Amino acid sequence: MNDATSGLDTLENSLLADIASAADEPAIEAVRIAAFGKKGTVSEMLKTLGAMTAEERQLKGPVINGLKNRVTEALTARKAELKDVAIAARLAAEKVDVTLPVRQSPAERGRIHPISQVIDEIAAIFGDLGFAIAEGPDIETDYYNFTALNFPEGHPAREMHDTFFFQPDEKGERKLLRTHTSPVQIRTMEKQKPPIRIVIPGKTYRQDSDATHSPMFHQVEGLVIDKTANVANMKWVLEEFCKAFFEVPSVKMRFRPSFFPFTEPSLEVDIQCDRSRPGEVRFGEGSDWMEILGCGMVHPNVLRAGGLDPDEYQGFAWGMGIDRIAMLKYGMPDLRAFFDADVRWLSHYGFRPLDMPTLFGGLSA
């Protein structure tokens, strides 16, 4: 028994030494196979237990099983240790030196696109006025884009030369790229009871392209629905927005009669400005006027389409082009440059990352 025990001790010491010296997982796997493979040293010893008498098995069984358990534990521990070493080496290799100086060249620094900046500015202003942000799909149905918004069947906007239509589906229904963000008004009224106060920024699509128009452009509109909303409320909201957005203490606005299928009465809004200097527009002063947005009281048919009773609820809505007001505020002459992906243009007109616009800190600080 002493010779047998001595042999087991020698085997155990040899296996533990091999495990300790294993430098990687393949080496560990080789030791495991040498010990516990089909013809491994420990496996062969375990096979002998079946041929032993009960007395021999009682004496040698715990010794052999103890060897097996200790070698197994050593293999598991060494595998975990090697895994930790590998992770530490990888982390060291991929480490970023945060003490390195920042990139100084404007071309190397990322900039926020003016459209993203202006959307954040709009969200900050209307958020301060108690409005929520609403969104909807870019691909719309004819119903939400036109019918529910009181567009008659023969309206020019329904024609192929103005709107991007998809092929009709198997039911003959056709979808389209939305021509305005107004479908979100209907979707919101369908699932939310008044009072409703939302602004809706997003992409819109029309077949138009020149220095001031793009086939894809950005629009924002607002919607207020309750039992007492009126033109005076709308006028106040729009004045507060224009003062905050153009960062002027006061602004003069004039409202002109117009026509939109989804509002009655419909109005277009001009804002006072000074265009006496070439290539520059100053708001809140001067004797010139510039159209800035369209607005009106929500048409009763639109309220009905949204599931609301026009005898109980009323509201007002307005809309404007985000690209256009960005051009006016920041002096960008050509809308097409917004979408050219020119890093030189973006480094000139872009904004510093992480400087989120707030009314307290300054919208365009």
UniProtKB/Swiss-Prot annotation:
- Please share the entry's free-text remark on the cofactor: Binds 2 magnesium ions per tetramer.
Q: Which GO MF term does the entry hold, naming one? A: phenylalanine-tRNA ligase activity
The Enzyme Commission number assigned here is 6.1.1.20
Q: GO CC terms for this protein?
A: cytoplasm
Record keyword Protein biosynthesis present: yes
The UniProt keyword set, sorted, is: Aminoacyl-tRNA synthetase, ATP-binding, Cytoplasm, Ligase, Magnesium, Metal-binding, Nucleotide-binding, Protein biosynthesis
GO biological process, alphabetically ordered: phenylalanyl-tRNA aminoacylation
SUPFAM superfamilies noted in UniProt: Class II aaRS and biotin synthetases, tRNA-binding arm
List the Pfam families hit by this protein, alphabetically: Phe_tRNA-synt_N, tRNA-synt_2d
> Which InterPro entries does UniProt cross-reference here?
aa-tRNA-synth_II, aa-tRNA-synth_II/BPL/LPL, Phe-tRNA-synth_IIc_asu, Phe-tRNA_ligase_II_N, Phe_tRNA_ligase_alpha1_bac, Phenylalanyl-tRNA_Synthase, tRNA-bd_arm
Q: Which CDD domains match?
A: PheRS_alpha_core
**What PROSITE patterns does the database record attribute to this sequence?**
AA_TRNA_LIGASE_II (PS50862)
Does Cytoplasm appear among the keywords? yes
Principal localisation: cytoplasm
* Subunit text: Tetramer of two alpha and two beta subunits.
Q: What is this protein called?
A: Phenylalanine--tRNA ligase alpha subunit
